[in-house]
Amino acid sequence: MTRRFFYVLLLLLPLSLWAQPEDYTWDVAGSNSAESMPCGGGDIGMNVWTEDGDILMYVCRSGSFDENNTLLKAGRIRLHVGEPYVYNTASENTPSEKHTYSQTLHLSDGTMTLSCPTHSVTLWVDVWKPVIHVEVNATKAVHAQIFYESWRDYDHPVGRQEAQQCSYKWTAPKDLVTHADTIIRRDDFIEFYHQNPPATVFDYTVMQQGLLSEASHLYNPLKDLISGGRLRGMTSKALRHHHFQLTLANVQGSREEWRKTLDATERNVRLKADRLVTRQWWAAFWQRSWIRCDGEAAELSRNYTLFRYMLGCNAHSAWPTKFNGGLFTFDPRYVDSQSDFSPDYRRWGGGTHTAQNQRLVYWPLLVSGDYDLLQPQFDFYLRLLSTAETRSRVYWGHGGACFTEQIENFGLPNPAEYGSKRPDGFDPGLEYNAWLEYEWDTVLEFCQMILLSKTYGGMDISKYLPLVRSCLQFFDEHYRYLALQRGRKNLDEDGHLVIYPGSACETYKMAYNPSSTLAALRTVTETYMHEVDTIGMIGFLQRIPPIPHRIVDGKEMIAPAMAWERINNEESPQLYPVFPWRLYGLGRDNLEIARNTYLYDPDVVRFRSSKGWKQDNIWAACLGLTEEAARLTAEKLKSGPYRFPAFWGPGFDWSPDHNWGGTGMIGLQSMLLQEVDGEIIILPAWPKSWNVSFKLHASGGRTVEVEYRDGEVKKKIIQ
């Protein structure tokens, strides 16, 4: 038995070593938070850098929303150990000192180490408990001082521009403030928390949108929310080994309940065991999938891996990873010199979840096999299902869930985007907004992700099925309802729904049968029927209109819609039937039509870019346009403008731009692996000169492992 186990271990060892990512190291100290390195786990992120000889850490925990729906940082931690760190900013002139300082992110186990000749500091976050550990190890006894620093020690007025960080945005009242935190210093710990007052932006939004009679039934994550933590480990003694612990808690309740939660977490800390299970989790995370390139593409796969690490830091959260910075925003003046605000600032809000952007953070997780990372985004919509159904019932008197594009974490449209100066009699269910009116189909992408999580990973999705059904029901009932507002019939002469007014993304407005919406309805319905219920959705499927085509300069292509009133943004929804809906593309009879759309549609060509949330690299890969896909994906995944390579942006949003990273991930994956009706296509858009080894996930619970080198497939394992 022992010998057999030994041989099995030897067989598994090469795969294990190949899967583990390389460390990422700096040997020159940074000088500000924009030159920070991320570290995290569970639902906590830290930006770590050195400044004036001290180690500084911004700490952010997912779900720490204030009364205005700003996503607050827990604060800043400063660690001073003995003598200041030796700086290497002049290392080019003094090569003998080049390695006196190092800061290393150990991706394989999620830890970070900062080292100088006299001591090292190791940082790690428990992936199962909201606890940060700071460990100092020195060659001789040293004093180590740790400080908690806050910028919220007074009521801070929030002006109109700074209010972009919260749900009020440009409609912020003149007296808007971020209320002060409570900070308590004791001999052996520091305790700090932000407690939301009784009235929050939730109450304002409910009143604004005519739902006061329903308020007690609506989900409210801001009510009585207390977020903060407790820092322990301070000592005046000089020691060779110091250990500091920062425990965080977010509780909707009283201060006593919040403290009980902190106490319980602290009692459950088992340092050695917690360190072991955290390292095991990260090791298993990297075993799930990988992409390793060398040569000219090595930078792309490295940055793919670094960004995937950042996503992994929010794996066990109650809240999705925000597209506009996730857990790793830094001082805003380094993103925009005109935004000299607090570290809590990020453009496009903290509790506002823009669906078109959020989806791009989550699509790549199916192919990477990170199904647990998908769950916070799925749960986000599930929690809001009742609120979305309430909107349909109160405003229009029919069923189904109406989710809007700029959606708050309590399920209603963002109050600024909803419109504060609305005409009398305007439909209260609609956003009075030229970009967002009638755009409510993005939730269907998350519905498809839910269904594919079962297809790919065997996830139990039973609790999410009412959400999927209700989202489809909304389109069936609402567009028949609108048709009857216009005339006697609720379907067209072919028995199809009339999706009007519709919206093809934010771009083609007042659209008639937009192709992006029709592709979404058809794909989600067919996937639902295949995975769950073959019979019950047949009638609805038959009512979905066909995707419209048009002829431009003699070439047939997908139309954005049958008709539209105006173009309002710069998206290309006519390619959504290619991605995310995979109805057109390689291995299908309609490939030429899709390629014509990509290559010759004048708007698609005009809007093409690799910036931010732009998806052209993905479409090029899905259409087998290898040179184009490689060029655009290389532009996506090349190192960003900040010191840490996977801090992209700000793009159209903020830094680090997570939908920039998400589109890069999807594009790289799609160049390596695609499927058509369950048939796997290997290297569909991969340059012959790029060497790669990868393991990715496919439908049916399959994994695909390939080594491609010097223009040949050296290994292919599908299991």
Residue ranges and their predicted role:
Residues 8, 141-142, 457-462:
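Secondary-structure transition into beta-strands, especially the periplasmic turns and strand N-termini
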